[in-house]
């Protein structure tokens, strides 16, 4: 058993069914442990339920049964939004950026939701600029997002995921919409951040190259999770 000092996430016996119109078992008795500083890749065929699992682990979706503990806190309906805001960062395939806002405003959005001051010169704004620097986009800070390329948008989404200094980042096909070269750069930035700052990463991908860069690989087959 892992020591609890480094365990950031523990999922136990997660089950998820959908009904349309008959019952379909999406996830069956899925259990997973993730340590601080660990990067976990979950691969599997399309339609296996990878994104559903990621959303459950990230507290965005409710399992039918099973337990989820993040940072030694058992997730419940009463604490999950606070835990999500304080401990979790998300990177989605489709970016989910606000197109009429600047790159910096998008990066600072989690801080704004958390009611932190994002005024010019504030520590939070300085952190936003530092994150844009880390992803190589400080020159684009005041550009509206709609003017930027797909690769730039995904790097902004990555910087935004890091804004509240989360302990764990969940990434759903983070390079799914990017060309090979841009995807490679994105993977480097993501993993450098995770390993350099002792964060944890759980990502869903069907890119074997990206999966190999992670410290642990799992495969979802017929609703069951297997370590590779």
Curated annotation (Swiss-Prot):
Keyword hit for Membrane? yes
Major place of localization? membrane
Q: What Gene3D superfamilies does the annotation carry?
A: P-loop containing nucleotide triphosphate hydrolases (3.40.50.300)
Residues of the signal peptide: none
Q: Could you say which residues bind ATP here?
A: 44-51
Q: Does the keyword Nucleotide-binding apply?
A: yes
Q: Any idea of its EC number?
A: 7.6.2.-
Subcellular locations according to the entry: Cell inner membrane
User: Which family does the entry's similarity section mention?
Assistant: Belongs to the ABC transporter superfamily. Lipoprotein translocase (TC 3.A.1.125) family.
Known partners and oligomeric status: The complex is composed of two ATP-binding proteins (LolD) and two transmembrane proteins (LolC and LolE).
Described by its record, this protein's role is as follows: Part of the ABC transporter complex LolCDE involved in the translocation of mature outer membrane-directed lipoproteins, from the inner membrane to the periplasmic chaperone, LolA. Responsible for the formation of the LolA-lipoprotein complex in an ATP-dependent manner.
Listed name of the protein = Lipoprotein-releasing system ATP-binding protein LolD
The record lists the organism as: Protochlamydia amoebophila (strain UWE25)
């Amino acid at each position: 058993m892992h020591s609890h000092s480094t365990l950031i996430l523990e999922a136990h016996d997660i089950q998820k069914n959908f009904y349309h119109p008959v019952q379909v078992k999406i996830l069956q008795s899925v259990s997973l442990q993730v340590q601080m500083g660990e990067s976990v890749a979950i691969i599997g065929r399309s339609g296996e339920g990878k994104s559903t699992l990621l959303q459950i682990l990230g507290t965005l979706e409710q399992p039918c049964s099973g337990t989820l503990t993040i940072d030694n806190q058992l997730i419940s309906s009463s604490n999950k939004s606070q835990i999500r805001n304080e401990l979790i960062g998300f990177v989605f395939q489709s970016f989910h950026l606000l197109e009429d806002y600047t790159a910096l405003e998008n990066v600072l959005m989690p801080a704004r939701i958390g009611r932190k001051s994002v005024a010019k010169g504030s520590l939070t704004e300085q952190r936003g600029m530092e994150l844009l620097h880390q992803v190589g986009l400080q020159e684009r800070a005041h550009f509206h997002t709609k003017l930027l390329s797909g690769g730039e948008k995904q790097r902004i989404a990555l910087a935004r995921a890091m804004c509240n200094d989360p302990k764990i980042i969940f990434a759903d096909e983070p390079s799914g919409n990017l060309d090979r070269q841009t995807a490679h750069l994105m993977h480097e930035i993501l993993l450098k951040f995770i390993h350099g700052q002792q964060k944890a990463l759980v990502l869903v991908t069907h890119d074997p190259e990206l999966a190999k860069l992670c410290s642990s690989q799992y495969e979802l087959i017929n609703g069951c999770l297997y370590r590779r």
